[in-house]
């Protein structure tokens, strides 16, 4: 079998139809590479050739590189990998310079290697489909476009214009591609697509790439051009400020682009291959491919969903509480076409919650991303009410009131009598054990936790929490609903704080411990950023609010005392108590916390924090390791204790729910990639120096002895 069908028509035009065997999408796998080798030799041997057309037999044009292959590439494979990449690119370059017109007939999405094939053609025609996406997203997986994407995008767009598409992996549709000059024409269907490709070849028999024409200049100039040189002088520093040195891919892309712009095309392609090999054989790309590709795909395929239970769809959803979380859940549900009953204690409160959806939808309309009619249609799906009777017939009701067990019990009992037969009652709680909340329900088998993250419209993750008696059917329905509204579910078992809130708390606590130890707050925040966290722990604590943290600690302490246990006091408790009760600094919402929030200026760390500051010789690496290890070790404890049931959910949940450094591939993958044996030793060092919270869990010790990764 061949991944490329070779057909020569009566006009001596060769049509290459891309058709990977046994796959729904075309990829640059071994079969494709062998097939490209074969067709390139065949094309070179043609005595009568008028042109070449690349087209696809799949629903899309081409999906990109084979990530299953890429994740296996090790440093010892570097030479073979480099040669393989160079050979593939050599074939595309040969076809590009055959001396006949080459056309890409794009019937759908072309990403990564697929877009690189298209770029190696002289003319690109796409079907006018708003769903089609083009671009080079490799950077989001710790890689760079290694099939000529950097070289050709820079030569077609110029360095500055190409950078956002290369270093941020921005994807774009047909209209944007046309405005950039990357798509030259459109067609309405596959037949017109082929007809236009043939017609263009006949009309342009002497075609070649613009950058292969003698005297061609890169748009905007090359790195020696004064205006470009001025930008490039500060670009690396700006990039470093953004990546904090955690992500080698954007740096490699910038280097390959700038170096490649100063040499001929073939040398530039070789430079690109070297940087690509460096990234592909490195650890960070493996971390990111493992989680952002394989992990997310496993979750999409229902990895933690009970098997053999029919797929389910919610048809009417009730949301109790129209505050920030309830309003966000109502919006996320309605925008997917599901009717929502948004209930609060008064119609006025419920309408305020609905107004949140109006605000978000109005913004979409003003940006041209939605019609006014569509906005009105979505808003009509949200019924704001104070009457529990309006919940009649809901097959899912989500309680989203304040974190208070008595209040949650009250609204649950009021609402669940209106559930449809076999309906599901859910609680959006971030800390309260679901089994305890389920006691208020008439059927704890149909009760489950759905922990959304704020702001709901932007946060992709939903943590599904199984109570002690939650049935498999209820879990399957919850999983299906989360996917129905386009979000990513992870599944955990019940415990205080579950997984995400519990581990997230360790990050914030570690930041405040460092402050209590006397470390300058700016050093703490910078260490977190250098670790790869999106925001520093003190800034995050302000967002959460110190009063909420104090309240949760108080509730936890009471609950543990009722169980005959104690929550030991720590230096963090003193920091929080002082800020709230002595200094009246309660967080961002109150206008003052660890940071000051001037009305007309940027937030900045409050100078009064120097009351905790003393000489502290802690190294930056120790701070970075404390921040990463404290979360990773507690994640491992969650897995060991059965709170988490899968490493995939641990890694995906830690990144999308906690903000754990994405370069690591997640909290457990951080330990794997660190080296299990080394991770155990480092944890022991940190425990000896900073406290027992760094003591390696038994599972880490066991895996270190067995020389196995945690899987």
Question: For the regions a protein language model found, what residue spans apply to each?
Answer:
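N-terminal glycine-rich phosphate-binding loop for ADP-containing cofactors
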Residues: 7-9, 19, 72-77, 82-87, ...
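Conserved catalytic cysteine-centered active-site region
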Residues: 91-104
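Gly/Ser-rich catalytic serine loop of serine hydrolases
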Residues: 104, 108-114
